[in-house]
Every structure is written in C-alpha cells, then in structure tokens.
C-alpha cells in the first residue's frame, strides 16, 4: 500500500510540473481513496466470525489469503471458488464451522494454479459429533460434506489437517493436474459406538492427472473411491479403519470410465477390505489399466480383496456392462482378522473380466470363498 501511495504522490507531482496552477485559481486535488487502495492489497488476512464472508467477498483482490482462526457461520460455505490464477491460500490456527443440518460443503475451492496449504498448527475442525447418528449420508440428520476441490487446474493442496468430518471429506470433481500432499483426516472419534459413517477420505470423479501422496486417513468408509477419471496416482499413504482402496462404484453417472489408476506403497489397517472394485448391476462403463502395487494390509474384517460387478445388489448375477480389464495386482501381502473375513472374492459377469495379472499376492488368516463367479484365466480365489 505504501508503494502505491508513493506512486500516486509522484503522479500528482508530475501533473503539477506539467500544468502549473493559476495563482488566481489554485488547483484542488482530491485525497486518494484509502479504502480503494486497501482493496488492492496483495496479501489479505481474514479471521473470526466475519472471516468467511469477508474472504468470499474480497478473494479476487488478494494474491495471498491467510485464514486465521476463522469461525464459519452455520449453513455457510467458506467459498474460495473462482479464485484468481496463482492465488495462495494459507490456513492458520483452528477453522471451525457452525452447526446446521444441510448438505454443505463447508469449504469450496476452485481456480487455476491455486495453492492451498495449512501451517503446522492449523486444523480444520468439523466437530462431526454434532451430526453423527450412525446413518451417514443414508438417513438421519442431513450432514454437510466437507471440502469441494472442484474445477481446479494445475493446483496443489498440501499439509491440510481435517478433524472429525460430519460425512464425506474431499470431493475431487472436474479437476485436472491436481497434486495433494501430506493430507491428514482424523475421524477416529467417530469410531465410538459406530456413530460416524460415509466419511470417505477422497471421492474422485471426472478428473484427470490427480496425484495424492503422503496421506493419512483414519475414517469409516473408503479411504479413496474413484468413481470416474483417468491418470490417477495414490501413494506413500496410510488408510485405517475404513473401507480401503476402492474403484467405484462405477455406473449410473454421466461419466463411468476409470482408466490408468495406480495405488502404490500404501498400508491399509483394520479396514473392511483392503482392495475393492465395485461396479453397478445393469449399468455401463469401463474399468481398465488399474494397478495395485506394494500394498500391505492387516486385520481386514470382511474381505482382503473383493471384485464385484453386482455391487448394488449382490443377490443378482453380475452383469457385463462395466468390463474390468488390464487389472494388475503386484506384491500384495495382507491378513484377515479372522474366519469371518473372506480372503479373496470375485463376482464377474460372463466374459467381462479379462487380462488380469496377479503376482506376489498373499492373503492369510481368513476363509477361502467357494462362491466366486467367472474368475479370469490365471487368477484364483484360493491363494
């Protein structure tokens, strides 16, 4: 601001030199509008109960936005959509959210070349226990989704710590070339009495070139669920307490293609299953070029590895509308909690699962299924 005031003063001086005032008619010069100058500031800090509304209104006037101990009012989104190219958003302290039954999101970010990060002490606290009722998104209280990373291009989200989300956490949709690093979601409080549900870590749809590394997800649903998209990479992460690493469910959406996905170097702990591909009975789409590599898991409760082409109605014969091809498992080692866990279960439609390659796959401690259907050549449910 000081530099801008100096510039204004210099311009006024130049005008005075070029056009000397008539002593009989002295020139009157208006003072600069201080409020206007403030709006041009490149670094903006917003805090407290008015921080969210002020940030949403002033976001395009700032190249760097600090959100310091912001208290977002109930039923309100911390709206950082349509940011100017290159905007840098930094969370400081504790961001909190008022209570209301609504769908959310609590936070929304979109734009090009955007960086969103949290300082070392920053936490986005959803205080989800106010909504948790064991129903998740399937009934009971209407619960707000947490963080929409929609329509982001060539952007980065890093060092974000989210605590106790009411329901799903990150929704990644319509984004391209997005990198997410060192994301922590801690919903362990929701394990009490199984009150938290549908607290997916990352739901990905209609997005390309998404890279997620260094995540730690403690939740009660999919750690990652890729419903559609291409060129997606998830690595060097820990998933605990949820439903593991999932493709799908695929089908029933505008975009039902999943292609070129890699999960690498992930530990899956105490989850329903470690590896899952689920496609919708009777729908169409495709799943291809999916690789799980160097995955370690322990104490799976329901399945070690499960592939279902009748996900929404397992009583029906799997259908062929969403073929699963070029599916690679390499160096997968894990354990089931007990015999109630099925080590491997495959339910494919007739001829709709092909070109699978599994090497170095070991699942122990559970039961072996004798109900697998249309298992591809070279693959077995009895490892």
UniProtKB/Swiss-Prot annotation:
Protein name: Probable endopolygalacturonase C
Glycan-linked positions: 260
Family: Belongs to the glycosyl hydrolase 28 family.
Residue ranges the record assigns to the propeptide: 17-40
Signal peptide interval: 1-16
Described purpose of this protein according to its UniProt entry: Involved in maceration and soft-rotting of plant tissue. Hydrolyzes the 1,4-alpha glycosidic bonds of de-esterified pectate in the smooth region of the plant cell wall.
GO cellular component terms attached to this protein's record: extracellular region
EC number(s) from the headed UniProt entry: 3.2.1.15
Keyword Chaperone: no
Top-level taxon: Eukaryota
Keyword Acetylation: no
Entry annotation: catalytic residues: 221 (proton donor), 243
Catalytic EC class: hydrolase
PbH1 repeat windows: 175-206, 207-228, 253-279, 287-309
Positions of disulphide bridges: 44-62, 223-239, 348-353, 372-381
Catalytic activity: (1,4-alpha-D-galacturonosyl)n+m + H2O = (1,4-alpha-D-galacturonosyl)n + (1,4-alpha-D-galacturonosyl)m
Localization of this protein: Secreted
Gene Ontology molecular-function annotations: polygalacturonase activity
Any one biological process term the GO annotation gives: cell wall organization
Keywords, in A-Z order: Cell wall biogenesis/degradation, Cleavage on pair of basic residues, Disulfide bond, Glycoprotein, Glycosidase, Hydrolase, Repeat, Secreted, Signal, Zymogen
UniProt organism field: Aspergillus niger
């Amino acid at each position: 601001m000081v530099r801008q005031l100096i510039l204004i003063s210099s311009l006024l001086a130049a005008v005075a030199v070029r056009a000397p005032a008539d002593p009989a008619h002295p020139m009157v010069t208006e003072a600069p509008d201080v409020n206007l100058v403030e709006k041009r500031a490149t670094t903006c800090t917003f805090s407290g109960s008015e921080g969210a509304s002020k940030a949403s209104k002033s976001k395009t006037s700032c190249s760097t936005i600090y959100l310091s101990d912001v208290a977002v009012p109930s039923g309100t989104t911390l709206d950082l959509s349509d940011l100017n190219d290159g905007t840098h958003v930094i969370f400081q302290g504790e961001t909190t959210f008022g209570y209301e039954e609504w769908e959310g999101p609590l936070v929304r970010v979109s734009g090009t070349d955007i960086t969103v990060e949290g300082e070392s002490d920053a936490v986005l606290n959803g205080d989800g226990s106010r909504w948790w009722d064991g129903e998740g998104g399937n009934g009971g209280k209407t619960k707000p989704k947490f963080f929409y990373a929609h329509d982001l291009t060539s952007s980065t989200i890093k060092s974000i710590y989210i605590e106790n989300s009411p329901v799903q956490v990150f929704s990644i949709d319509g984004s391209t070339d997005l990198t997410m690093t060192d994301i922590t979601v801690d919903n362990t409080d929701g394990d009490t009495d199984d009150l938290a549900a549908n607290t997916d870590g990352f739901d990905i749809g209609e997005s390309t070139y998404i890279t997620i590394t260094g995540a730690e997800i403690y939740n009660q649903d999919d750690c990652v669920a890729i419903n559609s998209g291409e060129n997606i990479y998830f690595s060097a992460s820990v998933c605990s307490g949820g439903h593991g690493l999932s493709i799908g469910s695929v089908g029933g959406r505008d975009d039902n293609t999943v292609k070129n996905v890699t999960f690498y170097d992930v530990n899956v702990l105490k989850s329903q299953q470690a590896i899952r591909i689920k496609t919708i009975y009777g729908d169409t789409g495709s799943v291809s070029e999916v690789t799980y590599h160097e995955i370690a898991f322990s104490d799976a409760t329901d399945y070690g590895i499960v592939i279902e082409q009748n996900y929404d109605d397992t009583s029906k014969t799997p259908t062929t509308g969403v073929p699963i091809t070029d599916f690679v498992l390499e160096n997968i080692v894990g354990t089931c909690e007990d015999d109630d866990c099925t080590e491997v279960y495959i339910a494919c439609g007739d001829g709709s699962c092909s070109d699978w390659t599994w090497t170095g796959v070991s699942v122990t401690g559970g039961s072996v299924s004798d109900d697998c259907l249309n298992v591809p050549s070279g693959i077995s449910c009895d490892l």
